[in-house]
Amino acid sequence: MGILSQLPIMHLLCAAMVFCQYEDYDFEDEYDEPNQHAYYFNPNTQPQVPPFPFPVECAKECFCPPAFPSSMYCDHRKLKTIPNIPNHVQQLYLQNNDIEAVPAGPFTNATFLREINLSHNKIKFHMIDSGVFAKLLNLVQLHLQFNELEQFPFPLPSSLERLLLGSNKISQLSGNTLEGLPNITTLDLCNNSLDDSALKEKPFANLRNLMQLNLCNNKFQTMPPDLPSSLMHLSLENNSISYIPENYFSRLPKIIALRMSHNNLQNIPRYTFNLPNLLELNLGHNKLKQVFYIPRSLQHLYIEDNDIEFINVTLMCPSMQPMNVNHLTYIRVDQNKLTVPISTYAFFCFPHIRTIYYGEQKVNKSTRLRTAVFRRYLTPEEFEEAEANHETHDQETEEDHGAEDNYFHPYF
């Protein structure tokens, strides 16, 4: 019993010896990481900029948040000139000012710039110093929408991934305009003055990484030629396109979303949209008289405000394959000339349908199908989601198709 009573004391002595052994040990020396390369902002990840050990330099006209020292905010300040940009700045925000020129001087030391936002200013092409952007070898994102550009602002650095030029006055794209931009994934040219002649030299053909192309609110009468097979999102709303060649999309197998509302489409070849990855198809506000084949991948179909009198389900779904079902969940068909609802055969062909929006029809002002909105097997959560989706799309199609937000919402 005497020996047992001394055991706790022996344990304490052993612990003390172990502690003394490591008392002077520097754990930081053991786990110090080797010198790291400077952290660069990646627009596709959440940045975690290391804290600066000293006060960061910032232009007096701007604000540099201590928590994000690599960003400089100069927006909404009625600036007429671009201030000098410190070397450490990676994100520069100059939108919503009165800037008319982009001289090279302020960018002399800005070698680490990754993103520049110059949208909503008064910049003209001839007021941009030649090569001012091309010298920024780390630049990946450039916003120049809502300015007064008459021409494409080349040359640009090969590092560029996102180029936003919507709402300018650009009317021409020469064949070499986009040369040297192999990394471009998003190109926005909505709300410009482009017509078919601007695409004669096939300016998009060599953009092998292009995934999103926005050409809405222009003057196109035909489909743009030779688009790259990498394309996933194509926006052509508010043009004057009247025809889609039968095999046009055969070279665009990765298309996820296609928006062609507010055009002059009348007849569409039956299998035009037989695409393996298509999720959203918007053909509202055209002159269509009949439907077409629906690919199995499609989830949302918008064909409102057309001249469709009858929806032939057998055209949309010529055969049923129990092991390979269609994924269509939402159809919008209001403002057509329907007098009867879609055949119940549609629910065998499209077993995932949750909502069909009939709304008012154009037979006469008072024509309205008995059920304005058909909803099938909806849980309360699904009901709220369907309602929200419909309200959101209403706003997009009726209010925002000519506004600033012409970008696809992310699917994933």
Task: Say what each PLM segment does.
Residues 66-115, 119-123:
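LRR N-terminal entry segment and analogous cap-like coil->beta motifs
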Residues 194, 199, 270, 274-394:
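Leucine-rich repeat domain C-terminal region
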Residues 1-71, 75-76, 88, 98, ...:
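Terminal targeting and flexible regions in eukaryotic proteins, enriched
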Residues 72, 92-94, 116-118, 139-144, ...:
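Conserved hydrophobic beta-strand positions in leucine-rich repeat
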Residues 80, 100, 124-126, 150, ...:
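Leucine-rich repeat
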Residues 105-109, 127-135, 153-159, 175-181, ...:
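A structural signal for leucine-rich repeat
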Residues 77, 97, 121, 144-147, ...:
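Consensus "Asn ladder" position of solenoid repeat domains
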